[in-house]
Each structure stands twice: as C-alpha cells, then as structure tokens.
C-alpha cells in the first residue's frame, strides 16, 4: 500500500481526491532518483523579528535547506523544547499573527524552497480551515504539519487540503500502534513525520536505533515518504538519519544560531544570519551525502 492523493476517513472510506500535484511529493521523487534524503529546516516566523525572519528563511534555502518548516508561534507550545519556546516567545512579543505568516511562505517559494507550515491546530481552526487552506495555497504553500491533530479528527482539514492541493503531514511516534500507523499513512499526503520520541523537541547528544525502526514500521503501514525529527544537531547525526529516512528535520540546532548565549534573547541579526548560513551548509553536507 502506498500513499496517494486520495484522502479517506480514518476507517478507509474515500473522502475526496486532490488532482493537484504534491509539492513535497515532487521533491521526494526528485531526491529518490538522486538517492539522497531531503533536508527540512524549521524556524518560527517572526523570530527574532519579522524582517530578519524572512531573511533567515531565504538564507536557509540559499545554503542547502530543501524545505522550510515555518513555525506559527503559539502561547502554549506543549511539544516544543526550551530553545524553540524561547524563540516563539520572542516572536509572540513582536505581535506576530497567522495572517502574516503567508509572507514567509511566499519568501520561501520565491527562493526555490518547499514551504511548509507547522502549527498547533487551534490556530488554524480559529483562523478558519477553508480560509487558511485558500490563503496558504495562494501564497505558494506546500503542506501543513499538525503535531496535535490526528486523522480521526481531521475531516474538515482533509477536505480543505484536497480542494487546495495541500499536503497533510501527521505525526507518528515509537509508541504508535500498527493501526495508528496505518491510519496516518492512509490519510497523509506528501510525507509522514516520524517523531523519534514523544515529548518536547530539542537537540540530542546521541541518536539510537529507535527512529530507524519507526521509519520501517511506518513504511510497512503504507507511507511512501517518511521524514524523521529527532534533535539532529551535527552533520554526522544528519548523515546517520539520512541513511534510512526520506528526509531529515532539523529545528533547535538552526533556531540556536539566532539566539544569544543566554538562550533567552535574540543574537545580533547580522551575526545570527551568518551562523545560520554556516549551520545550514554543515547539515546539508551531511544529510545530502548520507548514502
């Protein structure tokens, strides 16, 4: 069983069909032909301020990031670690709202990257699901990562994303049952996000074998593309994960470059962008040469 553009209810009944191509799916098709994984990088929009965040997204793409996961800052980020929470807090203090994030989507698309948004579902729901899908598509968006939305409760989003040709990226974890993996694979579009462990995000000193097993189980459940988010912070770690995953997702290590040494305030923008470019290149080298 493979992932198609056909959405279903959690029980497997067809819900709708999108005839628009998957932008992230096209990226994976290209990279599989080249036998290399994709590099997906995360930064919250509005951090350290709106203008610099746009420069940061462009810098990432120019220095090796293939798809940019644009985070929507949220006041209660239960799954984010201290580094991302600090960045999101700065962005929220800048008054960032969901309306303005589409400017970041356009920036990534114009730079040649694949624009993704990561958002807690409450933000999308209150903005309006259909309105969000329409505005996201019009800005050139590819797909939405929803860490707290499961397929069983995603009927409205599945229908809206089909109408607008947007990818649905659901999460799985090592604790996910086979039934849950199958439900996610059946309803996902673009790729499945394999969270290496449940709990908050953050950089890891070492990486064990559990993510590789999760990728294998998720593929067996029917997912065509599986990307891993595990706290990768070095080129060596990126290469290790990239040897078996279709994509490597990096967040905290990139956010860290724009934070000051106290991990609470923003670094000087010029210095931060320079560090971000260097870190992006370092990770891209490891990830893209993993095989």
UniProtKB/Swiss-Prot annotation:
<comment type="pathway">
    <text>Amino-acid biosynthesis; L-tryptophan biosynthesis; L-tryptophan from chorismate: step 5/5.</text>
</comment>
<keyword id="KW-0456">Lyase</keyword>
<keyword id="KW-0028">Amino-acid biosynthesis</keyword>
<dbReference type="GO" id="GO:0004834">
    <property type="term" value="F:tryptophan synthase activity"/>
</dbReference>
<feature type="active site" description="Proton acceptor">
    <location>
        <position position="69"/>
    </location>
</feature>
<dbReference type="GO" id="GO:0005829">
    <property type="term" value="C:cytosol"/>
</dbReference>
<comment type="function">
    <text>The alpha subunit is responsible for the aldol cleavage of indoleglycerol phosphate to indole and glyceraldehyde 3-phosphate.</text>
</comment>
<dbReference type="InterPro" id="IPR013785">
    <property type="entry name" value="Aldolase_TIM"/>
</dbReference>
<comment type="subunit">
    <text>Tetramer of two alpha and two beta chains.</text>
</comment>
<keyword id="KW-0822">Tryptophan biosynthesis</keyword>
<dbReference type="InterPro" id="IPR002028">
    <property type="entry name" value="Trp_synthase_suA"/>
</dbReference>
<protein>
    <recommendedName>
        <fullName>Tryptophan synthase alpha chain</fullName>
        <ecNumber>4.2.1.20</ecNumber>
    </recommendedName>
</protein>
<dbReference type="InterPro" id="IPR011060">
    <property type="entry name" value="RibuloseP-bd_barrel"/>
</dbReference>
<keyword id="KW-0057">Aromatic amino acid biosynthesis</keyword>
<comment type="similarity">
    <text>Belongs to the TrpA family.</text>
</comment>
<dbReference type="Pfam" id="PF00290">
    <property type="entry name" value="Trp_syntA"/>
</dbReference>
<feature type="active site" description="Proton acceptor">
    <location>
        <position position="80"/>
    </location>
</feature>
<dbReference type="InterPro" id="IPR018204">
    <property type="entry name" value="Trp_synthase_alpha_AS"/>
</dbReference>
């Amino acid at each position: 069983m493979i992932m198609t553009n056909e959405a279903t209810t959690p029980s497997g009944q067809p819900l709708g069909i999108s005839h628009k191509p998957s932008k992230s799916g096209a990226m994976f098709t290209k990279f599989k032909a080249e036998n290399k994984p994709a590099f997906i990088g995360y930064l919250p929009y509005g951090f350290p301020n709106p203008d610099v965040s746009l420069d940061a997204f462009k810098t990432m793409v120019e220095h090796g990031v293939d798809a940019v996961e644009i985070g929507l800052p949220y006041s209660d980020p239960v799954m984010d670690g201290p580094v991302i929470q600090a960045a999101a807090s700065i962005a929220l203090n800048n008054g960032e709202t969901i309306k303005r994030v589409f400017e970041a989507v356009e920036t990534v698309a114009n730079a040649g990257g694949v624009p993704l948004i990561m958002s807690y579902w409450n933000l999308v729901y209150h903005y309006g699901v259909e309105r969000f899908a329409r505005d996201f598509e019009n800005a050139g968006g590819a797909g939405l990562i929803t860490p707290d939305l499961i397929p069983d409760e995603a009927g409205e989003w599945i229908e809206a994303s089909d109408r607008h040709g947007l990818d649905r990226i659901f999460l799985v974890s090592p604790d996910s049952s086979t039934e849950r993996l199958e439900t996610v694979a059946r309803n996902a579009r673009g790729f499945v996000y394999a969270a290496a462990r449940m709990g908050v995000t953050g950089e890891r000193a070492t990486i064990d074998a559990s993510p590789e097993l999760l990728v294998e189980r998720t593929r067996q459940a029917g997912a065509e593309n599986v990307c891993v988010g595990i706290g990768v912070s070095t080129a060596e770690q990126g290469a290790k994960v990239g040897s078996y995953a279709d994509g490597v997702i990096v967040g905290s290590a990139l956010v860290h470059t724009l934070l000051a040494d106290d991990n609470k305030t923003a670094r000087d923008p010029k210095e931060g962008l320079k560090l971000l470019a260097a870190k992006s290149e370092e990770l891209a080298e490891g990830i893209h040469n993993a095989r």
